[in-house]
């Protein structure tokens, strides 16, 4: 329903994120007039040898990278043609690109992305690898204006949500970046997540442990490592392979410690969501009811959300756990949980919000 509160909030939120008035108008009007215009515009420029460079800019824009350093654009262009000239490219595509000192910005990115598909994984991988290699920090802990380009270009979550690459192609992308990016822990976290979603749990564990050796106190690293152990354990249990219970319990204990650790309090909601959701999945995979101690721990963590703003995903999880308790003779846990569940939701989030960044 486009007129529901949830739909209106999503539209307003998206418009506020736009830095391009045409993209904002496109989003708010469903964009058909703009789309028709730029479809004709793309057709007119279809034979242009610089078209792949424009496509590369659109792929990066879908990951939240709207502005690029001029030398990076030149590198991307020279991969397509040794004769590539940035000034000529800007002149040809002045409708959709502009240059400020040192940087090139893509405009109409949202519209163009709807017209330019993701059916060239080779070009997409090439583009993202070029961006990552150009923008990779010189050393761990260094952050400058290019760091966000590096992080967005290899973010598994962003790439999956954008629909640019399959999970197997994401792994291929990161395998090609090990040598130039191996000194940065963020790379190893993404490499680990990519291995995990491809079912390569041992590789994922190795990559994430390497990241932890570089940043032992990072929430992102510790959360990803604990989550991998739990997912790995459930995979083993569902396939009747190895000691899945041991793997899962090790990860669950680590996630619980993260959840109750005060220094990670800003990310409490993510830890609780992962811990409780995975225990419910464990119960389903093993066809075993949670023991009373585990159920009490889950309930206690959820009850502490009383002091945190709720979103729709947390509300849904609390409701799911209440139903679980009611169906498995643990009704004494329900009254306190219902008090939390009755708190009005403060905001709406998509499912992907709780995926590891």
Language model features with spans:
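Residue at a conserved register position within TPR or TPR-like alpha-solenoid repeats
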Residues: 195, 229, 236, 279-281, ...
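Polyanionic, low-complexity intrinsically disordered segments
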Residues: 188-189, 285, 313, 349
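Amphipathic alpha-helical "lid/sensor" segments that cap RecA-like P-loop NTPase cores
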Residues: 1-66
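Alpha-helical repeat scaffolds
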Residues: 128-132, 165-178, 202-213, 239-262, ...
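Residue-level recognition of tetratricopeptide repeat
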Residues: 184, 218-219, 225, 263-270, ...
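C-terminal leucine-rich, beta-strand-based interaction scaffolds used for sensing/assembly
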Residues: 62-216, 220-223, 227, 247
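TPR repeat positional signature
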Residues: 150, 188, 222, 229, ...
